[in-house]
Structure formats: C-alpha cells, structure tokens
C-alpha cells in the first residue's frame, strides 16, 4: 500500500504540469478564439477547441515561434 501515495502524488504533479503556460498565455478548458499575427480578420469558432494554453485576449500568436506578443510586435504590422 506504500505505492498508493506515490501514485496519487504522481498524478497530481502530471495534472498541474499540463496547465503550465508560457508568457502571455493562459489555460482554457474551452478555447474558442486565438488571434494570430497577420490573421486579425479570421472569424472565431463558436464551439470549444481542444483544452490548451492560448494567448491572453490582447495578445497575438507569432508564427513560426509560437510566442504570444502585442499586435505592434507582429511582423509587418
């Protein structure tokens, strides 16, 4: 029975680790829209996407490095 606490601890660590987001990102269980540099006119989905970290509402995803940045930092702004 000594393995039970170890298993619980491992599951807890794994569950919290997947919610670690990068700078200017936040976790959502139901992301619907994420702005991307160069695609500000792209319509947003009305259904939930896959749970993930996505850019904060006032930030844009820069391609190809995937960082979340201010709109003015987007290439060719």
Swiss-Prot record:
Residues 1-17 form the signal peptide. GO terms for molecular function: serine-type endopeptidase inhibitor activity. Gene3D superfamilies: Laminin (2.10.25.10). Keywords: Disulfide bond, Protease inhibitor, Secreted, Serine protease inhibitor, Signal. The keyword Nuclease does not apply. The keyword Disulfide bond applies. One of its GO terms (cellular component) is extracellular region. It is found in: Secreted. Disulfide bonds join 21-53, 30-48, 33-44, 37-74, 55-68. This is Serine protease inhibitor 2.
């Amino acid at each position: 029975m000594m393995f039970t606490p170890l298993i619980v601890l491992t599951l807890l660590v794994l569950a919290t680790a997947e919610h670690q987001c990068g700078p200017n990102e936040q976790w959502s269980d139901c992301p619907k829209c994420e702005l991307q540099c160069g695609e500000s006119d792209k319509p947003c989905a009305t259904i939930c996407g896959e749970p993930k970290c996505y850019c904060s509402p006032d930030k844009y995803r820069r391609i190809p490095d995937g960082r979340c940045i201010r709109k003015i930092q987007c290439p060719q702004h």
